[in-house]
Each structure stands twice: as C-alpha cells, then as structure tokens.
C-alpha cells in the first residue's frame, strides 16, 4: 500500500516499466500551472512556475510594481488610467 504522502492528490502516478519487464508505480509531483495576468489572462514572462520553493523571493517574480500579477501591457494601461483619473 502507498505511504500516506503518496495518497494525496499532489502526487501523480507514473507507470514505469523496469528492465526486468515488470511495471511499477512511481509517484511524482504534479506540475504547477503557468502564472497568468490578472487582467488579460496571458501567460506571464519572468515568473517561474515549477518548484518555486527552490528559488529565492527575487527569482520567483519580476521586481516591479504588480510584478507577478500583471503583464507589462496591462500595467502600462493601468498606470495611464490612474494618472488620467479614469477609474
């Protein structure tokens, strides 16, 4: 029977064929989804999406206002709207 950590949904089952001909089940972490912009839903550049616990805080997302939440185009339009007073 699998150990309790392998019974969680965060691990996926991978069937692996061994050199002896038997097939066994290996458990591996599921891949995270790609980070997307909050306004236009396009994938964000410069944001790592897998194994984020291995990276430092500055490596995980860009160092700018709304970095990791908005893409550069949406941020540009948001800044323009706030300066012009449009809500």
Curated annotation (Swiss-Prot):
- Organism domain of life: Archaea
Please state what the protein is called: Large ribosomal subunit protein eL34
Q: Which family does the record assign?
A: Belongs to the eukaryotic ribosomal protein eL34 family.
NCBIfam families given for it?
PRK04059.1
Q: Name one GO cellular component term.
A: ribosome
> What's the short name of a Pfam family annotated to this entry?
Ribosomal_L34e
- Keyword Cell division included in the entry's annotation: no
Q: Which is one GO molecular function term here?
A: structural constituent of ribosome
Keyword set, alphabetical order: Ribonucleoprotein, Ribosomal protein
Keyword hit for Membrane = no
A single GO BP term for this record reads: translation
């Amino acid at each position: 029977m699998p150990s309790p950590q392998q019974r969680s949904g965060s691990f996926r089952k991978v069937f692996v064929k061994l050199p002896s001909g038997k097939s066994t089940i290996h458990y591996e972490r599921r891949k995270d989804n790609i980070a997307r912009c909050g306004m236009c839903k396009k994938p964000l550049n410069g944001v790592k999406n897998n194994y984020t616990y291995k990276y430092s805080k500055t490596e995980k997302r860009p160092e700018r206002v709304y970095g990791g939440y908005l893409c550069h185009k949406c941020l540009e339009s948001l800044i323009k709207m706030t300066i012009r007073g449009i809500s």
